[in-house]
């Protein structure tokens, strides 16, 4: 009798969840995150840990010449090199159904990635990012303030803003090849338009005009959902919990 009772208890414990509970189980995604200019995958370590702790898979790509790969820096590194970095990581790790997230300059990169391998991408998410059309470069997109800034920090083929000049700190932002800002993006694959996309605009109410509002408007014009969160341009540092919640909501 005791044996039968124990067997029934075990049966209850291993019985499958009711259908309603199974439907409510959280979905887990594969995120590939592309950082912004001067940065590196290191800047997304905390976000990686938070998403991984919630059951997701996270791949942080560091673009050639930046972050822990700054020893490969060269003024010959261009936009295509950075697109190749992400494409090859996805292919070599055999990743599929990827939620591809690009922050800031990373928007240039992920646009090229979706054009190359749309079949591997579940959704592309632009996080306060550049959203280029074919034939555009970072520098060709109209923005007088950006053009003046780039001109003021260009040295010997690199972009060297003041905050990257302290070489005693690790990890840190590092100089980036100017060519990554001047190379033109060429989009040739119409299948990229079938990939779901979304835009996240971070904004500070006291900052107007917002330099990324034009890209949120582009996204809205394409019929994409646009999400807004109050934050500075670096939510991966300053508003981590809110960013993780929004990244989970978007897919």
Regions found by a protein language model. Give the residues of each.
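Residue in the alpha/beta-hydrolase core beta-strand immediately N-terminal to the catalytic nucleophile
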Residues: 62, 98-99, 122-125
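Active-site loop/oxyanion-hole signature of alpha/beta-hydrolase fold enzymes
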Residues: 57, 65-98, 115-116, 141-143
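Gly/Ala-rich beta-loop-alpha elbow adjacent to hydrolase catalytic centers
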Residues: 101-102, 106, 110
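Bacterial N-terminal signal peptides
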Residues: 5-15
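Conserved HGGG/HGGXW glycine-rich cap/lid loop of the alpha/beta-hydrolase fold
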Residues: 26-68
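Active-site nucleophile elbow and catalytic-triad environment of alpha/beta-hydrolase enzymes
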Residues: 171-190, 211
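Conserved loop-alpha-helix segment in the C-terminal half of the alpha/beta-hydrolase fold
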Residues: 203-230, 234-237, 242, 247-250
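Flexible "cap/lid" loop of the alpha/beta hydrolase fold
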Residues: 75, 115, 119-121, 125-159, ...
């Amino acid at each position: 009798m005791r044996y039968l009772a124990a067997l029934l208890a075990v049966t209850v414990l291993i019985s499958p969840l009711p259908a309603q509970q199974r439907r409510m189980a959280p979905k887990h995604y594969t995120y590939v995150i592309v950082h912004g200019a001067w940065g590196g995958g290191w800047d997304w370590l905390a976000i990686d840990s938070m998403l991984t702790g919630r059951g997701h898979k996270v791949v942080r790509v560091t673009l050639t010449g930046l972050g822990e790969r700054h020893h490969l820096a060269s003024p010959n590194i261009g936009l295509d090199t950075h697109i190749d970095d992400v494409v090859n990581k996805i292919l070599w790790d055999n990743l599929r159904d990827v939620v591809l997230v690009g922050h800031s300059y990373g928007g240039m990169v992920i646009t090229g990635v979706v054009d190359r391998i749309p079949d591997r991408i579940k959704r592309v998410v632009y996080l306060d990012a550049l959203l280029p059309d074919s034939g555009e470069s970072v520098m060709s997109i109209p923005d007088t303030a950006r053009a003046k800034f780039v001109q003021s920090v260009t040295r010997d083929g690199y972009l060297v803003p003041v905050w990257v000049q302290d070489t005693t700190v690790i990890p840190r932002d590092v100089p980036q090849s100017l060519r990554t800002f001047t190379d033109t993006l060429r989009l040739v694959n119409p299948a990229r338009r079938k990939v779901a996309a979304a835009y996240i605009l971070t904004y500070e109410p006291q900052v107007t005009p917002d330099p990324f509002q034009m890209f949120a408007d582009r996204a809205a014009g394409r019929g994409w959902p646009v999400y807004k969160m109050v934050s500075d341009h670096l939510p991966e540092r300053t508003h981590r919990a809110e960013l993780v919640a929004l990244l989970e909501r978007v897919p």
